[in-house]
Amino acid sequence: MRDNLFIYLQYLLPHALTSRLVSKLADSENKIIKNHLIKLAIKKFNINLVEAKETDISKYKSFNDFFIRELKDDLRPISNDKNVISSPADGVLSQFGTITDNSLIQAKGKLFSLESLIASSSTTNFTKFATIYLSPKDYHRVHMPIDGKLTKMVYIPGKLFSVNKITTSKVDNLFAKNERLICYFDTIIGEIAVIFVGALLVAGIETVWHGKIAPNYYKDIQTWDYNSAKFNIKFNKGDILGWFNFGSTVIILTSGNNVSFKFEENQNNIKIQVNQDLALITE
């Protein structure tokens, strides 16, 4: 009953307005406001500040600046093996596996289509997926899982339902309903996609090459083509791609049949860290 009420209230909320108000508050550089919000978040979400490069909260210019904090150097070691695909984020590996009949697993007994996720009937050769949920206490920067060249970026406007165990099990096509940013890369295994999924109270999605894109900065689908000769945006595995200002979800799509996850496919809700081995590229 409580779960259904929680979902119903989210349908009534003005998602975009709520997230914009949160964004404005989170960007405030008023010392009293931002320090209070940071202390509140640390206590509420049990944030491990010891891992942060900057542990003095007074040094953060805003609440958002704190939420996209950097980690201490070498805290998340990464494999140099080119055949290892790394986790792009700290969080929980909620679902992963093979894309079957153009469908991905959202939660136990609940599927959604690849076509609806990327808002295109051209689903290329995507065969595997991994979904990582970032809670408010997690490190919020998103890193490149494999060496690659940026070819395209697509912004898809949508709702901003919260993302958690309740909504993933109750809201149909949650990840295909929410606002999202899809970044396509050319890699040694073919095309991959790194998808930033927005959520309620997420005060923004930013990339290192474009800047802030969400929430709801555009009313229609927007596409940026980086495949022309004037662009040559390359990333090494582990490089920072962008970040969330609060928390949400990252979905990775990979091509081909030579990707094998390092976990059993009947596992889910696995705690994972950025740069940790996620999958292997097999011969």
UniProtKB/Swiss-Prot annotation:
Record-listed E.C. numbers: 4.1.1.65
Catalysed reaction, written as an equation: a 1,2-diacyl-sn-glycero-3-phospho-L-serine + H(+) = a 1,2-diacyl-sn-glycero-3-phosphoethanolamine + CO2
Pyruvic acid (Ser) modified-residue sites: S248
Keyword Membrane set for record: yes
Active site (catalytic residues): D90, H143, S248
Cofactor(s) named in the record: pyruvate
Keyword Cytoplasm: no
Alphabetized UniProt keyword annotations: Cell membrane, Decarboxylase, Lipid biosynthesis, Lipid metabolism, Lyase, Membrane, Phospholipid biosynthesis, Phospholipid metabolism, Pyruvate, Zymogen
UniProt topology in membrane: Peripheral membrane protein
GO molecular function, one term: phosphatidylserine decarboxylase activity
Taxonomic superkingdom: Bacteria
GO cellular component: plasma membrane
Record note on quaternary structure: Heterodimer of a large membrane-associated beta subunit and a small pyruvoyl-containing alpha subunit.
Function statement: Catalyzes the formation of phosphatidylethanolamine (PtdEtn) from phosphatidylserine (PtdSer).
Protein name from the UniProt record: Phosphatidylserine decarboxylase proenzyme
